[in-house]
C-alpha cells in the first residue's frame, strides 16, 4: 500500500478518536447506504425526481437529487413545498407525488451494481465482519434485489429502511438503529456513504464515516459533510479496508 495512502488513513483515524473520545477503532461491522453505494441507481432516481417535480411545477435539478439523497421521499417533497409554495405538504400530497415518482422509476431499466462493491462486501464477509444496509428507501422490491444480487452477504432482518425510523438522514437515527440491530458501539462500526446527508447522519451517530464519490458531486461536497475519509471508487475503499479494519 502506498505510504501516503496509509498515512492519510492513520491521520483520519487519529482525528476521529480525538473528536469522539474513543480509545480505539475496533471494527466489527459495516453499514452501507444502498443507492449509489450498492446499486448504480442514482442516475435513475435523479431522472425520476426531476420529471416528477416538473409535473407539479417545481424546478429541480439532478444535483439537488444527489444533495438530498438519503432523505425520505416524504421529507424531500415537504422541503420543496416549503421552498416553492411556502407551506408544508399534506400526507396525501406526499403519497400522491411519491407514487408518481415510484411509477416513473419502475419503468426504467434495472440499475447495475456499483463497480467493485461485491469485492468490498466479500472481503468483509471473509473476515467475519458484520454487514447491513441503511437506506432511506422503503420499497420492498428494492430490498429483495439486495438479496438477489448479494446472495447470503446481507441479512434482511438487520437492514434499516425508511419504515424503521421516524427521522431519516441527515438525522442519526437510521445509523443508530443500524448499530442497535448489529449490537455494536459507534467505534465498532463503519459507515459507507456516497451522499452528504448520509455522511452527516453517520457522523452524527458517532461512527467513522467513509464517503465514496460514485456520483456527480464534487469530492469537496462529501468532505464538507464531515466524512472521515473520501475515496473516488470502491477499488480505493477495498485497498484501504485492511488498514482500517486491522489497525
Per-range role (PLM):
Residues 113, 134, 167:
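Residue-level marker of regulatory loop/turn positions in helix-turn-helix DNA-binding domains and
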Residues 3-34, 38-127:
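N-terminal helical cap/lid subdomain that shapes the substrate entry/recognition surface
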Residues 1-28, 118, 122-125, 138-247:
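Asp-based, Mg2+/Mn2+-dependent phosphohydrolase catalytic module
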Amino acid at each position: 500500500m502506498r505510504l501516503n495512502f496509509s498515512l492519510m488513513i492513520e491521520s483520519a483515524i487519529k482525528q476521529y478518536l480525538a473528536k469522539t473520545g474513543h480509545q480505539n477503532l475496533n471494527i466489527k461491522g459495516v453499514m452501507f447506504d444502498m443507492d449509489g453505494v450498492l446499486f448504480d441507481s442514482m442516475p435513475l432516481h435523479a431522472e425520476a425526481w426531476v420529471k416528477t417535480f416538473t409535473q407539479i411545477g417545481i424546478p429541480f435539478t439532478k444535483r439537488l437529487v444527489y444533495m438530498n439523497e438519503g432523505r425520505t421521499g416524504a421529507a424531500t417533497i415537504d422541503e420543496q413545498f416549503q421552498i416553492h409554495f411556502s407551506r408544508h405538504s399534506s400526507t396525501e400530497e406526499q403519497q400522491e407525488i411519491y407514487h408518481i415518482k415510484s411509477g416513473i422509476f419502475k419503468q426504467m431499466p434495472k440499475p447495475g451494481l456499483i463497480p467493485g462493491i461485491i469485492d468490498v462486501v466479500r472481503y468483509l464477509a471473509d473476515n467475519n465482519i458484520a454487514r447491513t444496509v441503511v437506506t432511506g428507501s422503503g420499497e420492498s422490491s428494492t430490498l429483495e434485489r439486495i438479496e438477489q444480487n448479494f446472495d447470503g452477504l446481507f441479512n434482511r432482518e438487520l437492514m434499516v429502511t425508511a419504515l424503521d425510523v421516524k427521522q431519516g438522514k441527515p438525522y442519526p437515527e437510521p445509523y443508530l438503529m443500524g448499530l442497535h440491530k448489529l449490537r455494536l458501539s459507534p467505534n465498532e462500526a463503519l459507515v459507507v456513504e456516497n451522499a452528504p446527508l448520509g455522511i452527516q447522519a453517520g457522523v452524527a451517530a458517532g461512527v467513522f464515516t467513509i464517503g465514496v464519490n460514485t456520483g456527480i458531486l464534487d469530492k469537496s461536497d462529501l468532505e464538507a459533510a464531515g466524512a472521515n475519509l473520501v475515496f473516488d471508487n470502491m477499488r480505493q475503499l477495498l485497498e484501504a479496508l485492511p488498514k482500517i479494519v486491522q489497525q
